[in-house]
């Protein structure tokens, strides 16, 4: 008798879940197919859109983060600055100068030499170099951040990642000169 009651209870719960999922799934599909889904850059974001995406992105990157294969040196910062100036500065700015060309993107590219957030973190200097390396290597879907795995060598991607990890520190005059060597778009 006890088994049949608990079995009936689970059956009702299962049927209730199925009955609930059908209209939710249908509603979600109808909203995506016929509704005003924010797909234009100027549209307001869905509630919690940034938070949901950030959770998924961070989870993936944290599972695949690699360790820095070499120690930091001035030569690496200089070569990282050269690569950054040619490949990254048009979206992410240089020390003291925000990039304006791609500001209308959604999400807007973070300015990697500028303090942000409640803690005043400079760019992504609070991220491990391996985290930034993953982003530089793979890009972020639907954000405008391209993958540089076919454009930059493995070493070059690490050099840029190490440079932006240290964006909150004093850079040598040579690194600053390289970063400021060309006009931003």
Spans of features found by a protein language model:
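Periplasmic c-type cytochrome electron-transfer domains
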Residues: 2-78, 123-129, 148-163, 182-185
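Short acidic/polar micro-motifs centered on Gly/Asp/Asn
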Residues: 67-69, 82, 93-100
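Short, well-ordered turn and helix-capping elements at secondary-structure junctions
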Residues: 74, 95-97, 116, 149
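Sequence/structural segment immediately N-terminal to covalent heme-attachment motifs in c-type
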Residues: 74-94, 132, 185
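Short cysteine/histidine-rich zinc-coordinating motifs and their immediately flanking basic loops
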Residues: 100-106, 175
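Extracytoplasmic electron-transfer domains, predominantly the class I c-type cytochrome c fold
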Residues: 104-165
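Helix-loop element at the rim of GNAT/NAT acetyltransferase active sites that forms part
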Residues: 167-171
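Extracytoplasmic/periplasmic copper-protein system
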Residues: 173-185
């Amino acid at each position: 008798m006890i088994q049949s009651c608990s079995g009936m209870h689970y059956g009702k719960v299962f049927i209730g879940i199925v009955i609930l999922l059908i209209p939710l799934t249908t509603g979600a599909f109808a909203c995506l197919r016929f509704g005003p889904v924010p797909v234009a850059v100027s549209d307001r974001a869905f509630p919690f859109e940034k938070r949901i995406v950030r959770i998924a992105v961070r989870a993936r990157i944290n599972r695949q983060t690699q360790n820095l294969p070499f120690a930091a040196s001035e030569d690496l910062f200089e070569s990282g600055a050269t690569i950054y100036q040619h490949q990254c500065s048009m979206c992410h700015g240089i020390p003291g100068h925000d990039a304006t060309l791609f500001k209308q993107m959604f999400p807007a590219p973070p300015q990697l030499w500028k303090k942000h957030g409640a803690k005043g973190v400079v760019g992504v200097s609070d991220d491990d170099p391996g985290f930034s390396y993953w982003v530089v290597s793979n890009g972020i879907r639907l954000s405008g951040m391209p993958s540089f795995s076919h454009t930059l060598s493995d070493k070059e991607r690490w050099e840029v990642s190490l440079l932006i990890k240290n964006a909150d520190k004093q850079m040598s005059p040579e690194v600053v000169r390289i970063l400021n060597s060309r006009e931003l778009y």
